[in-house]
UniProtKB/Swiss-Prot annotation:
Catalytic activity as recorded in UniProt: uridine(54) in tRNA + (6R)-5,10-methylene-5,6,7,8-tetrahydrofolate + NADH + H(+) = 5-methyluridine(54) in tRNA + (6S)-5,6,7,8-tetrahydrofolate + NAD(+); uridine(54) in tRNA + (6R)-5,10-methylene-5,6,7,8-tetrahydrofolate + NADPH + H(+) = 5-methyluridine(54) in tRNA + (6S)-5,6,7,8-tetrahydrofolate + NADP(+)
InterPro entries listed in its UniProt record: FAD/NAD-bd_sf (IPR036188), MnmG-rel (IPR002218), MnmG-rel_CS (IPR020595), MnmG_N (IPR040131), TrmFO (IPR004417)
Annotated Gene3D superfamilies: FAD/NAD(P)-binding domain
Organism classification: Bacteria, Pseudomonadati, Pseudomonadota, Alphaproteobacteria, Hyphomicrobiales
Known cofactor(s): FAD
The keyword NADP is assigned to this record: yes
Descriptive protein name: Methylenetetrahydrofolate--tRNA-(uracil-5-)-methyltransferase TrmFO
Gene: trmFO
GO cellular component: cytosol
Family: Belongs to the MnmG family. TrmFO subfamily.
Functional description taken from the UniProt entry: Catalyzes the folate-dependent formation of 5-methyl-uridine at position 54 (M-5-U54) in all tRNAs.
Organism of derivation: Bartonella tribocorum (strain CIP 105476 / IBS 506)
Amino acid sequence: MLKTFDTPIHIIGGGLAGCEASWQIAQSGIPVILHEMRPQKKSDAHKTDKLAELVCSNSFRCDDSSTNAVGLLHAEMRLAKSLIMKAADANKVPAGSALAVDRDGFSKTVTSALENHSLITIKREEVQEISKDWKHVIVATGPLTSPAFAQELKAITGIKALSFFDAIAPIIHTDSIDMNICWYQSRYDKIGPEGTGKDYLNCPLNKEQYETFVEALKNAEKTEFRDFEKTPYFDGCLPIEIMAERGLETLRHGPMKPMGLTNAYNPTVKPYAVVQLRQDNKLGTLYNMVGFQTKLKYGEQVRIFRMIPGLEKAEFARLGGLHRNTYLNSPIILDQTLRLKQKKQLRFAGQITGCEGYVESAAIGLLAGRFAAAEYHHNCPCLPPQTTAFGALLNHITGGHIIDEEAERPSFQPMNINFGLFPPISPIRYSGKRLPSKEKKLAKKQAITARALNDCIQWLADKESKSSCLSKNT
């Protein structure tokens, strides 16, 4: 029987991350006080007072753990005895290969489990500031953090650490870019911090290609803002389709300007316009489209962005978007166990850390809960291997993203789990004839997921191992 303790861990926010963190902590014998502002104070998106309410879709996306990154994350969470996954499995509805749930049944299951846990106290109140008497705190307030608490977070983290508008550009798998068309070069061959003068991939367009591209953007189907997202555009974060509507030459003097770039494959012909791709993770497996934040519908993004020379066969790890959000510049202000570097009794979990999606949010809540419980028990939190979905996602949030500390706005952007976040797999050797491209990609995914599940099982079984632990002074 687990020993119980007197001092509680306070968790602010009863969404997926806060609920999962509460469960993981309580299951380790530690009392939890879960603070949820609803129904005392409503948000613009929630409709009920239930915990873990699914505000948008009822889908947890693909449940295939052998060939899909989010399905792999499902499997790892089940191995870690996730409450969120248990509730999802108990409330499944038909959805093909996806895991979709009865949203009301799901929320009721989570709420009931937490209300009936002897070590969890739920306080229905808005937290406007973090009490100095609270020794252990996890903040999991999500993208719709209340204005009052957002001000508290600004004061704690620093104004540059918090963003309130998601400017998301598409991200592309590097191995799907045509390197016979695109070339590496920084504008004017400028060498920045840790740069080489060849830090961008460049996609050239001639005049006809550029004008066709602009026309396609202007005529594309666009997603409208939801009522609670309505915020004026600001010039530093204009959707690319809005720029296209401002005039034929606007993009060519903005994110698609060709100045300072020479086509390595055709140096005597100056590109009329250039789309630049910037490395998005330290592994170099992902590149983002610079300045291409957008509200185009997903299908339109794929169709139109594949018109760009070199991206005809582009595979997208994430498509673009622009919507209201509240998230931290996590790689700068959080340590590897999700603690605030300058105030280590405070952890963050869920979407506010810079992950996207129901499952990702719950997974980071699970990790934050386990890290907090280990620390509470005076044990060293053990990091999941980066080869696991847990570790890949955590690494993106706390260190895998390339940081531009001189940028006016944080360069860090929220991310779903995807195979581009994982370390490359060792080359797969096949006996006999060469595999077709599709079969080779499938085999690669299967190898990554098999490695991940094996490493996750080992991590869960050996989580107190010194070899996978951080120093207590980290």
